[in-house]
Amino acid sequence: MISSVPKLQYYKLRDGASVPEFATEGSACFDLRVCWDTEEEMWGPIKGRNIKKWKKMLVPTGLAFNIPVGYSIRFHPKSGLACKHGITLTNCEGIIDSDYHHEVFVCVWNTSDENDYYLRQGDKICQAELVRNEHYHIEQTTEKPQKTTTRDGGFGSTGK
C-alpha cells in the first residue's frame, strides 16, 4: 500500500539549528526554534538578543525545508509567548511556499508596553504546520455580488 502521508524534509544550515519536532503526541503543529548566526551571538554576554518593547525582529531558524509541491508551511504564534510575554508574529500568520528553498526566518513583534524580551539560542519562537494548498481560479465578473442572506453590515455586524 502506498502511503499518502506527505513528507516534510528539513536541512540544517548551521550546527546550532534545532530539529523541528512536535511537543506532544497530540500536537497539531511542530515547534521552530531560534538559531543565531555566530558563536558570539549564541554565547556572548547576553546569550541572545533583546527585542525592545513595541519593536520587531527577524529571527533565524537555521533551517531550510523541502516542502512537497502542493503544500506550504504556515507559522502561528506560540500561545504562551503571546499571553505571558506579548511576543507574537508580526504578520499574524507566516507562509512558506513550496518553491522557497532558503533559510526560514520568523518575523516576531514584542507587543508588550512593559518589558523587553530576550530570545536565546534554542528558544521556541513559533509553531508551524504543513498545509495542503487548494488552487482555484480568480476571475473578474461584470455583475455586482448579490445579497444571499439577511446579514447587513460589515465589521462587528454579527454582534458580540
Region spans (language model):
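DUTPase catalytic domain/fold
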Residues: 1-160
